[in-house]
């Protein structure tokens, strides 16, 4: 999975897809518990415009257009999107309400209330393992609305907080248990593109846990990868996905002699909740 990073304005969507992405990531900002904009703000990655945005509902409707067969904007290879949910400032009650609002927003504006909506898979990424109630409420709303089947298309990523230090993987696992999640787990690690590349120790730990006999992680992705050398290193570690500002870089590496026989671009038929066994 090649995930175009910080795709927050609708006009950016075809640009990233044409550059080689088969997935995108957008930043969802809230007013209270209400998801309002796809917007990142400053600071952001080097070389990017930080302030592009769209209204949340319009953004989801546009994603639906690009992922609904028969629509004039349909891209067959666009198979997944990540919603980076900026819930960091919300209290517990707001987190639960935010889960309800995001569920209703996706149901109405992306899934078209279950009537020929978008077909892409969705990963809900939350910045704090304490926000597991978001996931519980999200799931409850879809069940109550009679669309529990749509949960087959939804995965989850609990990734922080980053300060004072990242939670242990055991703590992350416990948060998923509290959320009622068993499977459909994506986990990530990474650095902004202006930071020096570290030793990827946590990434290696996540991959090892994914591949363990009792691993709770379905897929692992790394961000933000803009260099050819970093792409090769991440692939050598064994990631399933890469988030990038330059999808064509990842495509180029996938076509290199050392990688084209080991990796390929994911398609819609590849299950994003199934751990690949070598």
Curated annotation (Swiss-Prot):
Recorded hits in InterPro entries, A to Z, give: PLC-like_Pdiesterase_TIM-brl
Q: Where does Mg(2+) bind?
A: 25, 27, 84
Q: What does this protein do?
A: Dermonecrotic toxins cleave the phosphodiester linkage between the phosphate and headgroup of certain phospholipids (sphingolipid and lysolipid substrates), forming an alcohol (often choline) and a cyclic phosphate. This toxin acts on sphingomyelin (SM). It may also act on ceramide phosphoethanolamine (CPE), lysophosphatidylcholine (LPC) and lysophosphatidylethanolamine (LPE), but not on lysophosphatidylserine (LPS), and lysophosphatidylglycerol (LPG). It acts by transphosphatidylation, releasing exclusively cyclic phosphate products as second products.
* Disulfides per UniProt: 44-50
List the subcellular locations.
Answer: Secreted
Cellular compartments per GO CC: extracellular region
What is annotated as the active site? 5, 40 (nucleophile)
Domain of life here? Answer: Eukaryota
Tissue specificity here reads: Expressed by the venom gland.
The molecule here is called Dermonecrotic toxin LlSicTox-alphaIII3iii
- GO MF assignments: lyase activity; metal ion binding; phosphoric diester hydrolase activity; toxin activity
Q: Which cofactor does it need?
A: Mg(2+)
The alphabetized UniProt keywords are: Cytolysis, Dermonecrotic toxin, Disulfide bond, Hemolysis, Lipid degradation, Lipid metabolism, Lyase, Magnesium, Metal-binding, Secreted, Toxin
Report the family membership. Answer: Belongs to the arthropod phospholipase D family. Class I subfamily.
The record's remark on the cofactor is: Binds 1 Mg(2+) ion per subunit.
GO biological process terms, semicolon-separated: killing of cells of another organism; lipid catabolic process
**EC numbers:** 4.6.1.-
Reactions listed under catalytic activity: an N-(acyl)-sphingosylphosphocholine = an N-(acyl)-sphingosyl-1,3-cyclic phosphate + choline; an N-(acyl)-sphingosylphosphoethanolamine = an N-(acyl)-sphingosyl-1,3-cyclic phosphate + ethanolamine; a 1-acyl-sn-glycero-3-phosphocholine = a 1-acyl-sn-glycero-2,3-cyclic phosphate + choline; a 1-acyl-sn-glycero-3-phosphoethanolamine = a 1-acyl-sn-glycero-2,3-cyclic phosphate + ethanolamine
């Amino acid at each position: 999975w090649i995930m175009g990073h910080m795709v927050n304005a609708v006009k950016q969507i075809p640009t990233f897809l044409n550059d080689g992405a088969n997935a995108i990531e957008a930043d969802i900002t809230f007013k209270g518990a209400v998801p309002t904009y796809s917007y990142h703000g400053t600071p952001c990655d080097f070389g990017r415009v930080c302030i592009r945005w769209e209204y949340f509902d319009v953004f989801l409707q546009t994603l639906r257009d690009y992922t609904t067969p028969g629509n004039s904007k349909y891209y067959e290879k666009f198979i997944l999107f990540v919603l980076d949910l900026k819930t960091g400032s919300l209290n517990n009650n707001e987190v639960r309400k935010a889960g309800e609002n995001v569920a209703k927003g996706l149901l109405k504006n992306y899934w078209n209330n279950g009537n020929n909506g978008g077909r892409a898979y969705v990963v809900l990424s939350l910045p704090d393992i304490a926000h597991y109630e978001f996931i519980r409420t999200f799931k409850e709303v879809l069940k109550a609305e009679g669309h529990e089947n749509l949960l087959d298309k939804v995965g989850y990523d609990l990734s922080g907080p980053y300060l004072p230090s990242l939670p242990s993987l055991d703590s992350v696992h416990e948060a998923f248990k509290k959320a009622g999640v068993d499977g459909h787990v994506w986990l990530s690690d990474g650095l902004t593109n202006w930071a020096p590349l570290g030793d990827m120790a946590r990434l290696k730990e996540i991959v090892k846990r994914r591949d363990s006999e009792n691993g709770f992680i379905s897929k692992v992705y790394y961000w933000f990868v803009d260099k050819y050398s970093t792409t090769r290193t991440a692939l050598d570690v064994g990631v399933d996905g890469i988030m990038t500002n330059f999808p064509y870089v990842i495509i180029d590496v996938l076509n290199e002699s050392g990688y084209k026989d080991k990796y390929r671009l994911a398609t819609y038929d590849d299950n994003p909740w199934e751990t690949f066994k070598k």
